Amino acid sequence: MDDRLRSHLRALISERHPVSSPVSLRRAQDYIAEEYRRVGLRVSFHAFRALGGTYKNVIGTLRPARAAFHRAKPPLIIAAHYDTIQDTPGADDNASGLAAMLEAAGRLHEASLSCEIRFIATCLEEQDLLGSVAYAASLREANEEILGAIVLECVGYTSEREGSQTAPPAMPIAIPRVGDFLGIVANTASAPLAKSFEQTAKREVADLKTVLLVVPGQGEQLPDTRRSDHAAFWQFGYPALMLTDTANFRNPHYHRSTDTLETLDLSFICRVAQAVSAMATSL
């Protein structure tokens, strides 16, 4: 698994910005679509207008077997953004999330499923969540229901050093001071989904430490809990959770030129992918 992850990361890590590196952004889009096809997913694109141009969310759809499809629940979304800010290669933010998502897709394509899984690589997350807002809005406009969205946002950096983990002010729960856990962030409406993920992770990936934070409303009282695509789904009334290493509250390379492959914990990314896969098969 480490070899596949490393291959994904090497292909994806580079600045992927809509203005300063559009070719690299398109290359990432093409790579993700090709990886979806390689593991047998049906590929489609959700195009949206933004920043004076057209951008695309890349969707890979995995349906349950024909017999199960007639009894299927609404779809589950597994998402990660593929753009970066300027002047960073974006290893943790967010090639790590993409690699975990692609690894989960590879693990699930022959699994027994009770619902459709949509793997969505979103674009322009770093530009006010434009891609995920456009997609969530399209779901609501079509009156489409989903089981929920699991958003992978910076899942590749760990530290065993005491004091390596910090937290935003006014946190309602105690946060460990060692940055070796996966954060699970949900709002109240998404708490059942988040607790199900937490229980599944503990059962199936025992060496993956997790910390669950549930915030009221849409996280308005703790703005740092709204900093990824899960907030777009909250906005349109859908359950969603963010899985994260907590970004700048742990990773000193966040949004810097030093956010490189060498700083990542591939074993941790593997465990996150295992937990996401286990969640999808347990529904």
Where are these regions (language model features)?
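N-terminal capping segment at the start of a domain
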Residues: 1-26, 83, 249-259
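Extracytoplasmic/secreted proteins, especially bacterial periplasmic and envelope-associated proteins
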Residues: 4-11, 23, 27, 31, ...
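A non-catalytic alpha/beta surface segment that caps or lines the substrate-entry region
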Residues: 7-65, 211-213
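Second-shell loop/turn segments in exported
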Residues: 14-24, 44-48, 85-94, 121-122, ...
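Solvent-exposed loop/turn segments at secondary-structure junctions
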Residues: 19, 42, 49-51, 64-66, ...
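Structural recognition of the beta-strand scaffold that forms the well-ordered cores
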Residues: 59, 76-79, 118-121, 147-152, ...
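Acidic/histidine-rich catalytic neighborhood of metal-dependent amide-processing enzymes
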Residues: 85-195, 222-225
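Active-site-adjacent substrate-binding region
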Residues: 163, 167-283
